[in-house]
Amino acid sequence: MKPLKGCPVAKDVRVAIVGSCFNSPIADRLVAGAQETFFDFGGDPSSLTIVRVPGAFEIPCAIKKLLSTSGQFHAVVACGVLIQGETSHYEHIADSVAAGVSRLSLDFCLPITFSVITAPNMEAAWERAGIKGPNLGASGMKTALEMASLFSLIGKE
């Protein structure tokens, strides 16, 4: 038996990127990285929807609205930036956003990747946005495309 494995291909794949605006210089890099990766893998501009929300907390709600009203996407990439502060606010938001995105992925049986940076400081966040390492938005898009491809194979074998 041959194992099923998806390939990162964007041709004929409809994807949404939901990105937060808070910490916009870094968040913008994540969204741009996801967008560039979509095009690098053959995506058509008309098959990509980009939605910007005020902060990371709003990401799950925006994804749910997109999926509930259109149902036209093969995958979603969630992009945002959370920087740890001196209060517990960071932990509450990070946990809530991660749980919300995960729950939506399961509820809609759809690949939704978590490209939300959770970092102890701005320097670490910049590193995860592609300054000293991979851009988390780009890697999230590649994963989303691989999973969309895999989902198209499941049940056809």
From Swiss-Prot:
Pfam families: DMRL_synthase. It comes from the Bacteria. It is an enzyme of class 2 (transferase). 5-amino-6-(D-ribitylamino)uracil binds at F22, A56, F57, E58, V81, L82, I83, F114. GO terms for molecular function: 6,7-dimethyl-8-ribityllumazine synthase activity. InterPro entries: LS, LS/RS, LS/RS_sf. Its EC number is 2.5.1.78. Pathway: Cofactor biosynthesis; riboflavin biosynthesis; riboflavin from 2-hydroxy-3-oxobutyl phosphate and 5-amino-6-(D-ribitylamino)uracil: step 1/2. GO terms for biological process: riboflavin biosynthetic process. The keyword Membrane does not apply. Catalyzes the formation of 6,7-dimethyl-8-ribityllumazine by condensation of 5-amino-6-(D-ribitylamino)uracil with 3,4-dihydroxy-2-butanone 4-phosphate. This is the penultimate step in the biosynthesis of riboflavin. This is 6,7-dimethyl-8-ribityllumazine synthase. It comes from Chlamydia trachomatis serovar D (strain ATCC VR-885 / DSM 19411 / UW-3/Cx). The lineage of its organism: Bacteria, Pseudomonadati, Chlamydiota, Chlamydiia, Chlamydiales. The gene is ribH.
